[in-house]
Design a protein with these regions (language model features):
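N-terminal amphipathic/basic-hydrophobic helices that include classical n-h-c signal peptides
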Residues: 1-14
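Conserved, well-structured ligand/cofactor-binding cores
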Residues: 12-282
Length: 282
């Protein structure tokens, strides 16, 4: 007898039994939790979509920024300062240093590094966000971030120092720095300077264009990536707990009708209904 599936709870209970994801394509469709786990934990490759609509969207976003700069339109964080300094216009000579200043200013994280899984999940979430075409970043930036994931270059991100409210500014600044060949990364099982890892991987340090440093750090991708890892672990715990319960009931010669659908329907709790259905299956 099958359990009732409400709000996808039953689907989530069976997540661990779904077909393995071997590749994640960026820029076409939304990436679900299994896709994030496939990249973060299992090293599934990421590729940028070749579809014209995706590439046109990215180019149009970048072009809009260029047009604003050419017209001397003030652009926050590009031609102005950050935060309370948003009313301060910067000289054209100082524009290239603005992004570097942002990166170094936020390099104040503390604590042990985040795990490899959590960091890779955060990087993928940032890539997915930027690939939507609203942040005026270029395709080469996305390619560099994808290359880091595919080559196993993982920035060393301190686990403490972010409030997440307007963005995981501090932790994401470490991703920003690593892409530019600064700070440290984990690569080939070792912790090393990012510049050395880039040389070994035959990658060039990325030269960020206007606004790209701000676009990289001003998002909540780190907390999103960590949440994805935690949710996946919780799903596995639910599956394990449900299996253990079924085994215990069987050992004690319990009755399946104790988990009859009518009992769950009386309370209408989706989780209870789906766990009861899974117990009946087992």
């Amino acid at each position: 007898m099958q359990g009732t599936n409400r709000d996808g709870v039953g689907d989530r209970l069976k997540m661990s039994r779904k077909k393995e994801i071997r590749k994640v394509t960026i820029g076409e469709t939304a990436v679900s939790l299994p896709g994030i786990i496939a990249v973060a934990r299992h090293g599934a490759p990421v590729v940028l979509s070749e579809k014209a609509a995706f590439r046109r969207r990215m180019e149009n976003s970048r072009r809009l920024l260029s047009q604003a700069l050419e017209a001397d339109v003030p652009v926050y964080g590009v031609t102005t300062g950050f935060g309370k300094s948003c009313g301060t216009l910067l000289s054209k000579k100082s524009l290239p240093q603005n992004g570097e200043t942002l990166m170094r200013f936020h390099g104040c994280g503390t604590g042990d590094p985040l795990g490899i899984e959590e960091t890779r999940a955060a990087m993928l979430c940032r890539l997915l966000c930027l690939a939507r075409g609203y942040s005026a970043v270029s395709l080469p930036l996305l390619e560099q971030l994808a290359a880091f994931l595919n080559l196993g270059i993982t920035p060393v991100i301190p686990s403490e120092g972010s409030v997440g409210a307007s963005g995981d500014l501090t932790p994401l600044s470490y991703v920003l720095g690593a892409m530019a060949g600064e700070r440290e990364v984990f690569y080939r099982g070792k912790r090393m300077p990012a510049a050395k890892a880039l040389r070994l991987a035959k990658l060039k340090p990325y030269l960020f264009g206007p606004k790209e440093p701000l676009s990289m750090v001003n998002g909540t991708s780190v907390m999103t990536g960590i949440a994805a890892i935690v949710l996946d672990r919780a799903q596995h715990l639910i599956e394990a707990a449900t299996s253990a319960t079924a085994l215990s009931v069987h050992a004690l010669r319990g009755k399946a009708h104790h988990y009859h659908p009518a009992i769950g329907e009386a309370k209408s709790f989706p989780g209870q209904i789906d766990v009861a259905g899974r117990l009946r299956e087992l």
